[in-house]
């Protein structure tokens, strides 16, 4: 009996030891496997994750620099938000085609919740039936080629007003082009939306700028979305709530005034379209939905178009040969005409090359807008959990040296034989993003860049003030969701 018990004890000990060894081997194997399948990433800190790597730099450049070291598909832990970053045309094409629907959502943000009426605008709306209907309205009604064309006369009129204002300021005196161009685009969009410029233009402009400042995606509320107390401690919730009250007051007054005067208008404005659809049986819109969409038009339209014009002029000032070439093309084609019509400049190839090259180097949204994974995805062997944020670094993609020779240089001629318009065939050129969540306002945005830029270059010669050499122009970028100049563009016109 003792021998049996001894054997049983030995057997049990052996079994436990064997089980322990097998469990250790299993855990080691699965851990090794998991490690092998983890996306490359920099070293991280507790709580904040990888945020410290982005301190002291603009997000798009900071993320680009990390990608150069850790790869064009990498993982970042931004606070409590797992994030994958795409920085190459190859991975952008793979994800925005094969996995486009899996990453069709937008992350919920405090800004979207408060300022954009619970994310009911086109840009931040979650993927689903509501978003599909909004996208359809944009494509067929608000931002169709026909609708964009219908605003041609007001674009021409407002561009001519800008020319007259600059001339009135006097030759040889510095002009704040940043301020003037932003005001021009805001006025064009105001008239397109409401049928006229609005008396509270300055207030609307400040609201739009504040919204853009709050949507950078890297502040406390964005990286710790579940820590509600931080939203209060940081002051962001209070700022956004105050901003929301201003928006409600301003847009409610505009809509009320517009409704009273609707019988006197002949051209259907963007607000007319939305009010017509408001009580539609097919897809009714609420008043808050309409306000969110109007904010999209201004927020996405004003800053992106004005900054593109600023960057184009900045690059041309820095590159006198390109400036001379585009001005010669304009002046030859227009042959002394006083006012420019859009038909006059549609076929001006070098002007269009300048715009494309500007958008390559200075995409309006350098990190586009983040997407979010709707379901777990296996991406090239990597397991991507649900709710993972996706950042596509268009800034890095547009400057990828594997696809672009002298990628950091401003060379409009590189587009001479290119058919790329708003997207490159290999996703090497993505100024407006790609896939389902691609910017629906590309046609309107390009129209609001081409004519103003042509007027500014055709009617005036430009130089830096105080005898500063062209190669000393400040090209520093600001930090935020959109790619703006850090300093305002002050230039001296002659005519």
Curated annotation (Swiss-Prot):
RNA-binding: present as a keyword of the record?
Answer: no
Which EC class, in a word? oxidoreductase
Q: Identify the keywords attached in UniProt to this record, alphabetized.
A: Endoplasmic reticulum, Glycoprotein, Heme, Iron, Membrane, Metal-binding, Monooxygenase, Oxidoreductase, Signal-anchor, Transmembrane, Transmembrane helix
What cofactor is this protein dependent on?
heme
Q: How is it used?
A: Artemisinin and derivatives (e.g. artesunate), are antimalarial drugs due to their endoperoxidase properties; they also display multiple pharmacological actions against inflammation,viral infections, and cell and tumor proliferation. Artesunate may be a promising treatment for COVID-19 mediated by the severe acute respiratory syndrome coronavirus 2 (2019-nCoV) (SARS-CoV-2) because of its anti-inflammatory activity, NF-kappaB (nuclear factor kappa B)-coronavirus effect and chloroquine-like endocytosis inhibition mechanism.
Marked site (Required for artemisinic alcohol oxidizing activity that catalyzes the conversion of artemisinic alcohol to artemisinic aldehyde) residue numbers: 479
Which pathway or pathways does this protein act in?
Sesquiterpene biosynthesis
**Parts of the chain on the Lumenal side:** 30-495
Q: Which chain regions cross the lipid bilayer?
A: 7-29
EC number(s) per UniProt? 1.14.14.114
Q: Which amino acids does the record list as binding heme? A: 439
Q: Which residue ranges are assigned to the Cytoplasmic compartment in the record's topology? A: 1-6
Q: What is the effect of changing residue 483 to V?
A: Reduced activity leading to a reduced accumulation of artemisinic acid
| Name of the protein in its database record | Amorpha-4,11-diene 12-monooxygenase
Q: Which organism is it from?
A: Artemisia annua
